Amino acid sequence: MIGIQEAAKAMIAAGTKGKIINTASIAGRTGYADWAPYCASKFAVVALTHAGARALAGKGITVNAFAPGVVATPLWEQLDKDLMAMGVSSAPGEAMENFSSSILLGRVAEPSDVVGTVRFLASPASDYMTGQVLMIDGGMILQ
């Protein structure tokens, strides 16, 4: 919320239109029992994206978000270790494999899969959209 407020404040003070791009997650669209606090924080990002879009559209500022699913990053490597420590999984890589088994495209995302969406949101091609959350999950939680 502070990021949206400060970015909007700077754009308004400069008299410019602009784009605010938030980072959500698939966890902001569906709840996961073992990750309730994380899910709550990402549901909040989605709600703040919607609220920010409504509040700032009249100032020429768009507010959108991207919501990655399982992305091959150090965060997921750590999460895999954490889930083993919690007893949710019993072998390295098992949690990530189980969690990503429902990805319709059959693989986890690479960071490069996310970059194109973020570039689109930052580009003039997205000028006529606001309040949207773009899922980058390979169809994992198809809605």
Residues of each region from the PLM?
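Active-site helix of classical SDR
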Residues: 4, 41, 49
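Alpha-helical segment proximal to the catalytic Tyr-Lys
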Residues: 9, 54-55, 127
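Residue(s) in the substrate-gating loop at a strand-loop-helix junction
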Residues: 25
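Short C-terminal tail/terminal secondary-structure segment
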Residues: 30, 118-119, 130-143
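Active-site loop immediately N-terminal to the catalytic Tyr-X3-Lys motif
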Residues: 30-36, 58-59, 106, 124
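Short, small/polar-rich loop/turn modules that mediate ligand/substrate recognition or access, typified
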Residues: 57, 62, 129-131
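A glycine/serine/threonine-rich, flexible loop-to-helix segment
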Residues: 71-102
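A conserved structural motif in NAD(P)-dependent oxidoreductases
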Residues: 90-93, 103-114, 125
